């Protein structure tokens, strides 16, 4: 493969996964690596968004790259992928200790753009770094123009949800639709434009001519296919 085609290939996640076809990893691992910009070339794992290179898949270096604040590809993946941000809270010892029994807060923080890196929280949108472990504190740390600043949660408790389910909503109003007017041009013979089409050509199965014009046709008027036989139908 020439260099130009290879450069186009690694521009997409699927293309970067394709470069890892010879690596002894399962498909899910390859996709995770490719989403953060990594691809395989000349026996090295490289990144399209930064200068990171690895001669093998090193879990610690991969984790550091995945949650990097300098790699363009990794940052884009974190901005777009809430589950990737959420996964960071299980990837660092400090986060596991702080949020091990606070799954709801992890959901709320990752929804607001935050992910864990080391012993801090960082926003994928505005790049702000905070040591706050509360949702309110982290939310206040956002930059004023951060896209994640105005995220909020809709909380329906079990009682409210049950009330919504029990509501007897009226059926939707169905407006009668006027029937479409008959279009004579649709059913007329495509040869004489007078009679109604009633002969189906086989094997192409195109219904385009009337019984009078059918014998004159050696090939189908639509697909130009050779007519093997004809099937007469009842005009509509």
From Swiss-Prot:
The keyword Ribonucleoprotein does not apply. Gene3D superfamilies: Zinc/RING finger domain, C3HC4 (zinc finger). The keyword Hydrolase does not apply. InterPro entries: BIR_rpt (IPR001370), Znf_RING/FYVE/PHD (IPR013083). Keywords: Apoptosis, Metal-binding, Zinc, Zinc-finger. BIR repeats lie at residues 85-150. Pfam families: zf-C3HC4_3. Zn(2+) binds at residues 123, 126, 142, 146. A zinc finger (RING-type) spans 189-223. It comes from the Viruses. One of its GO terms (molecular function) is zinc ion binding. This is Probable apoptosis inhibitor 2. It comes from Orgyia pseudotsugata multicapsid polyhedrosis virus.
